[in-house]
From Swiss-Prot:
EC number, UniProt record: 3.6.5.-
Bilayer topology: Single-pass membrane protein
Organism superkingdom: Eukaryota
TM helices/strands, residue ranges: 1123-1144
Binding positions (Mg(2+)): S530
Name of the featured protein: Translocase of chloroplast 126, chloroplastic
The keyword Plastid appears for this protein: yes
Subunit structure: Part of the TOC core complex.
Amino acid sequence: MDALRKLSSLGRNQDKILDTASSSSYTEASVAEIPKASVETGGKDEASPSGLAPIKVRVSNDVGAEIEEKRGGDEESVGSGESFDSALERLAASSVTSFEPPSPVGSVGEQSQFAGGVSEDLEERGQEEYLYYDDYGDDGEVEKDGSEKDSTSSSSSSSSSECSSSASNTEDEMDISEYGASSERAMPLANPSGVTDEEEEDGKELKYNVERAVTAEENMPNGLKLGSEARGIASSSRGAELGNAFKDSREDHEVQEELTERSVKVAVENYDQEGEDADSTEIKKEFPRELTQSRTVIESPAYRFTSEPVDPALLELKSEKAQPNTQSFARIAEGESDADADADADDEDVESGDEHEDGYTEINIRQAAGKSESENESGNNPSLGPAGPSLISVLVRKTARRPASTAATDTQSSNAASSTQVAGTTDVNPSIEVNEVNETREKLQNIRVKFLRLVHRLGQSPQNVVVAQVLYRLGLAESLRGGSTRNHTRAFDFDRANAIAEEQEADNQEEELDFACTILVLGKTGVGKSATINSIFDEHKSVTNAYNPSTTNVYEVVGTMLGVKVRFVDTPGLLFSVADQRHNERIMGRVKKYIKKASPDIVLYFDRMDMQTREFGDVPLLRTITNVFGTAVWFNTIVVLTHASTAPPDGPNGTPMGYELFVAQRSHSVQQSIRQVAGDMRLQNPVSLVENHPACRANRNGQRVLPNGQIWKPHLMLLCFASKILAEANTLLKLQDTAAPGRPFGQRSRVPPLPFLLSSLLQSRAQLKLPDEQLDESDESDDDEEDEEEGDEYDDLPPFRSLSKEELEELSKDQRQEYAEELAVRERLFQKKQHREQLQRRKEMKKRATAMRKEGLSHPADEADDEAGQPAAVPVPMPDMALPPSFDSDNPTHRYRYLETANQWLVRPVLETHGWDHDAGYDGFNVEKMFVVKNKIPASISGQVTKDKKESQVNFEAAASLKHGEGKVTLTGFDVQTIGKDLAYTLRAETRFNNFKRNKTTAGVTATYLNDTIAAGVKLEDRILIGKRVKMVVNGGVLTGKGDKAFGGSLEATLRGKEYPLSRTLSTLGLSVMDWHGDLAIGGNLQSQFMVGKTMMVGRANLNNRGSGQVSIRASSSEQLQMVLIGIVPILRSLINCRFGFGGGQSSQ
């Protein structure tokens, strides 16, 4: 403890030796060369973040006095808010090395570099490893001149350091015995033989050197470089040059080990006193900047370095003939033997220079070291310029920072290390996904190479803004899809792809690339569409005329440009007048039909630079294009402005307008019109300028040059090729649904609404019947048949005489009640008798019709009319249509009255009951017709058209039934209905047959065509009657379309009353299930209706698996008029909500 107490007096002379760069050579001595001195330990040092008393080595008193003279007696503690650069300068100027033993409690969540050794993910790079100081935050600092750098490097190479660690882990995580060993290896300890125990066991010697790294890397004037000749943190590579300053001395290994153990105990005691939370919080605030090792960010141990004058008492610990310590700064981590084995393997890989996957992978130590998000943004994200994210600037910046030799060495060693790591991972966890990712990455790299070859052939630079954006988007798409792994750097991919592209172009300049582009040309008439095509191919391929439209049909122009097959679809010119939009629609219809054969990759919309329409005069034309092709056409469009050499007009002040301003105004005008018709104000279509006049200025190569100096043809083709390249990458990475063959402009075909179509498929439909079967029983008559009873209850009743009103007044109250009950019973029995007679009559008519069909006799239509009294011969008024309640005094029912005439076509108006127009609420009309085909097949046609101010709805249905045996009927139908803005065409067929007397089964198929997509499905339904009162219907089906599937089914159980349909008592329980995209929807509903006296009560309730439901009760009566008062409840509730604000959220729902 005496030695530790002496250390307390060593923490107050920190800044006395800051300017030792110009001092005597005594201040440049290394730790290993300092003579033995006494050691003092004391209390907590304010300069130490962890609160440990640092171990300080002092120089001679003469040197201390000389330094004190230069400093003027100023004393300041290191770590009191100064920057890492200042700490490094102080370290360079220091004549001593003052170091703290590593704390046994490293930082939480990760292993400290000094307490636990170097992180597992850091690779030992052998003799050429560098450790850089990454100071991105100080980009604005001006580097010192060469002399200052040399001085700094010289100072830092002989500098000493103090290492300390913060106490931030819990006491449970500490292992003092193990930590003692790690601390012994982490610090430069003397050994009588000059070799550590580890080096004796391994039979090798690992040496490291810490010195100032003065490189060309920006923002790194004070960086650190890890060499191969050092003995630890405190040793220096220039000790030999300054050896004459001090006498050779040897550190006593046992004394150093004892000091280490004692310091550890002090650290544990301080940690127990201060607590974990406060300590860790303080350390987080004092964390300095970062160290970057081969683009890998780790925590900087800057707070462990201090500079203090040497205490003479510490010289007693030094031997006069101490040898340099050769203890290596080894990596210490969990699984020590495994780490050493991995280090050996990595060293072998570095020596052999093997690369993994042609240099694609690289150890991503940034993630292993746990770099923060802000650091990732400052280190990885490319700069955002006016043209968007630029990858080239990032590549140039990173390449310029590292010397060529350093980059080559680091790349080789990183690839070798990553090869070892990836191989080990594959052996442990083999996965097919790795192979798929590598294959996808290779294909994407081929796309990059192809694009760069196109760029070289067009004479463009890889630093072009368009090229940079394409490469950036390819990298971004790859990372989003998972193709970019953590061992993969975009800079390396670009360099490799660019080198391959240049090599292939140098060997095969005339080779035809596996690349083709189809371009659709649209625009006004006379703007120069065909002339531009001729200019691109440098030959006359399209007919042009300066005075009349030359292109009257849609046709293809195919040619080869720079080894690339380019196909243009030339179209007739469009007229921009509102009255000519019909003409434009016909042309667009022909174009749409033509491009179904081959979908274009890009659309060029042409307009003239010198013809500007005001106040959105082109909107009608652009809207016609949008209505025909959809809004997706504008997301793949490049705006081309011809006659680009036109002189700019005069400005508002009478002076000629600048050319760039004129181009910007004209481009903005066209882009704004496109945004308006596309409905997306964020849309920004690229603009390309074109000049086809023979007198256009040209360069030495004969290429036409615009007034702004741009060669327009390579620029236009680069935009087209870039769009096609991005489309290929999208197809490869499957970022979104690709367009179906023949679908124009890469539009995403919408998936049909399968749940809606499946619900329509599962719906039961009634079978059509012949006219002579209309009076026959309904489809469910067999289920409703009742056995004839042996007697008629109504006939067995005694005689009954009705009482007059005067006689009822003479009866008492009880007698009047008994009379009403008797009258109700007789009325019910009479209705039952009539229902039974009706069923018997239907049976007889069914038997007679069956007998007549067997004998081959037909039932004349006029005979049926005679039996029915010929009701169709005389027009009769149809019942009045039920109108919604209104506060108008006039009842406009007469407006909707119509007659049923002898005509077979039935036409009726359609009233919108919820419309705003009460007096004239016609919303559409309905048409129906029933007829028979060849006297055997009943058929029906019905349609309805509705139209309001915004949209129209069309519904059409045609159906026919065909009997092919007893109890077997097939129903076919064709439906047309509006879904959104498209028409859905459905063809359906189903067959019903009787399995048993009380069981019917139905099987059906359907096919729907919607939006260029076909959805097909099947269904199966079974009906069964249990007794006379219970009926069950079970159905299920599946519908598929465009690779998507939907499953559904329903169960319905009906319980009828004993006297149904006379009593109208009915209860229904339903359950429906729908599965689409893995989303299971389950719903249940219950409905019951019954009579309470003369009041009909109807109750409904439904609930689904998402917890939403509804309950409703309805009562209708002609006697209990007081039920109208129930309507006051919602009115009072609304008034209360408005007055007091209660239930506002619920009422809004």
